Amino acid sequence: KVDGLSVALEYRDGVFYQGATRGDGRKGEDVTGNLRTIRSIPMVLPEKLPRLIVRGEVYMARSVFEEINEELELEGKPLLANPRNAAAGSLRQKDPKMCARRRLDIAVFNLQLAEGRTFTTHAETLAYLKAQGFPTISHATLSKGEDILCEIDRLGDTRMDFPFDIDGAVVKLN
């Protein structure tokens, strides 16, 4: 699981319409303007569904975090605490230009709504999201409990190989 800030992205007729943080679970903060500055978020999708909602995690890559902190240190300004807080704070900036300078990224992990489309498995939804241009993270489809535990251990052992911080593993039924 990418360690960042969860957001929902809504598309209407294949065009990015609105984005919000998770907030209290029912109502989040509208951060559409700042989300538009994230280059990895597609603004127009190949398939023009009437309405599509996806969920993803906005994050700051460790390399970007380190570069920004080096710049802040040279300027004598306070350093950012960690990539997760830096991403969350950047996404909540009032000025989209400031957010753009923070070079945030996103990993989309769930399809919430796809009007006019049906899917049988979670793996199918991830393949669809990737085909629509959304960045997704690697995943495995496993059927045995012992294989799942081995994969979780592998993720723990290789966590520093990812360009972003992770705060665990997610196991979903397909």
Where are these regions (language model features)?
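RNA/tRNA-interacting regions in translation and RNA-turnover enzymes
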Residues: 1-174
